[in-house]
């Protein structure tokens, strides 16, 4: 077991790429990770890969060298963060119809919008002509978002297409749209969907919120609050460190680390409120 003193390296990554043999890839990836003490979740689909894993510095390095043996996954870029506590309880490799589930067919997810570098994001979205859309779920948005961003109020990514169609009803197709999410994959797929609706000026934050927080330092940025993450850290602060300021959604009291480890889908409640729920 990795010592707490050493800490854990957390790597989040994705790539939209045709993986015709993704079924065969599952046991190979799972065996590799288990043999090196790597834990987390890897999602495989015909349209690509999406994952967040954690382990020692050496094991994570070996994992990406392992991916390099596949031409389709070579040179994978990933977002790195760190934690003193183990972020995942087990290693899972899941086979899915979509690498991130939007729930619809009929559009090419490779026809994404244009990237905006984190260093240029604040200036770009400050224009009154830019509509900034948060593509995350409502329980994520509650913890933090970019100032002035539109919250679709969706409880899952599958609800986004219906919201987007309704939002688009009274919008000109040359409307400028900027989208963001946690690590980049949902907003990237969302831009492809918006383009399928006819929007021409569609942009998204490169690497998502996590990359932004790593790149743009200081209290004068447009980011407000904490960033929800899908592991036992639950949320990270502006320094991409595990948040120590998470509040119970029912009583607004402080939630400690032992409470956080049992949280799912943003149901962030202290022990007393969970007993009463």
Swiss-Prot record:
SMART domains, per database record: RHOD (SM00450)
Protein origin, superkingdom: Bacteria
GO molecular function: oxidoreductase activity, acting on paired donors, with incorporation or reduction of molecular oxygen
Domain Rhodanese residues, every copy: 126-221
Enzyme class of the recorded protein, top EC level: oxidoreductase
Active site, renumbered: 181
Segments forming a coiled coil: none
Catalytic activity: uridine(34) in tRNA + AH2 + O2 = 5-hydroxyuridine(34) in tRNA + A + H2O
Gene3D superfamilies noted in UniProt: 3.30.70.100, Rhodanese-like domain
Alphabetically ordered keywords of this record: Oxidoreductase, tRNA processing
InterPro entries: Rhodanese-like_dom (IPR001763), Rhodanese-like_dom_sf (IPR036873), TrhO (IPR020936), TRHO_N (IPR040503)
Biological role: Catalyzes oxygen-dependent 5-hydroxyuridine (ho5U) modification at position 34 in tRNAs.
HAMAP family: TrhO
PANTHER family: RHODANESE-LIKE DOMAIN-CONTAINING PROTEIN 7-RELATED (PTHR43268:SF3), THIOSULFATE SULFURTRANSFERASE/RHODANESE-LIKE DOMAIN-CONTAINING PROTEIN 2 (PTHR43268)
Protein name as it appears in the record: tRNA uridine(34) hydroxylase
Source species: Anaplasma marginale (strain Florida)
Gene from which the chain derives: trhO
């Amino acid at each position: 077991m990795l010592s707490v003193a050493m800490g854990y390296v957390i790597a989040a990554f994705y790539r939209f790429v045709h993986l015709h043999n993704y079924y065969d890839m599952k046991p190979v990836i799972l065996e590799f990770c288990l043999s090196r003490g790597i834990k987390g979740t890897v999602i495989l689909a015909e349209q690509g890969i999406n994952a967040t894993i954690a382990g020692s510095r050496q094991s994570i390095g070996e994992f990406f060298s392992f991916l390099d043996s596949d031409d389709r996954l070579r040179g994978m870029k990933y977002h790195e963060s760190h934690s003193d506590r183990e972020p995942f309880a087990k290693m899972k490799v899941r086979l899915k119809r979509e690498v991130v589930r939007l729930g619809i067919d009929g559009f090419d997810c490779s026809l994404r919008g244009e990237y905006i570098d984190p260093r240029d994001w604040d200036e770009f979205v400050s224009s009154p002509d830019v509509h900034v859309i948060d593509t995350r779920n409502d329980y994520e948005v509650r913890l933090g978002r970019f100032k002035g961003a539109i919250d679709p109020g969706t409880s899952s990514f599958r609800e986004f297409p219906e919201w987007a169609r309704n939002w688009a009803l009274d919008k000109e197709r040359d409307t400028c749209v900027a989208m963001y999410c946690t690590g980049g994959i949902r907003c990237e797929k969302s831009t492809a969907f918006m383009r399928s609706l006819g929007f021409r000026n569609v942009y998204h934050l490169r690497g998502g919120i996590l990359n932004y927080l790593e790149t743009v330092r200081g209290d004068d940025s447009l980011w407000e609050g904490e960033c929800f993450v899908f592991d036992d850290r639950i949320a990270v602060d502006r320094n991409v460190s595990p948040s120590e300021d998470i509040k119970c959604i029912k009583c607004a009291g402080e939630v400690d680390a032992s409470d956080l480890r049992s949280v799912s889908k943003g149901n962030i409640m202290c022990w007393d409120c969970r007993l009463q729920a």
